């Protein structure tokens, strides 16, 4: 499947549903070498004036579509909100996407802004954030050492896998991701890590956790290793901290 096909379909959708749009960007896997027969169309539509932003999942012909409708002001508001979280799907879609409609330069302006913000990277990790993740991983490793229940082991191991990737990305100043994007992000800074992690996770789920434990300790080492005794937080946090305790 050539890139021309998803671009054509996305433009047809925009013309049919939003004839007054000033810009549109097609992002996601459909315009990259990663696209598959299951790739959907991620379409960012920009309207003039004051409109309520929206996100809609739909089907256009044979194509599944994720449609993100914004004004330039709402687009910038969402991006400003996402950047402190170190994870922005909007930046990714627009930085890596294709401008399929641009009536007044808005499309190129937002694409360039997305590329600039993406290249600048997320906010630097604080010592507290790194320590929180170290503590969370240490707590999970302790839980795994004493775990004889297959169901509990499943969730401990998957949390170890996810948080190990998050620590690598946080420590290296890279953008975070979720789902398949977490694997892609971590492989960008440590090529092959997701495949290595997959192998040791499978062993751990079968009751052989030694290689997973060793890999997590390797991930922890550049940040100071395991952290448990002496870890302390006080006050009333506004939201759960990354790496918070895994118990009830």
Q: Residue spans of the language-model regions?
A:
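Metal-dependent nucleotidyltransferase catalytic core
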Residues: 1-20, 25-39, 44-95
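Exposed alpha-helical structural elements
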Residues: 5, 9, 13, 74, ...
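Conserved nucleotidyltransferase catalytic core and NTase-mimicking acidic/glycine-rich helix/loop elements
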Residues: 118-248
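Short N-terminal helix-initiation segments at or just after the protein's N-terminus
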Residues: 4-11, 99-108, 235-246
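Conserved NTP/Mg2+-binding pocket subregion across the NTase superfamily
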Residues: 56-57, 63-148
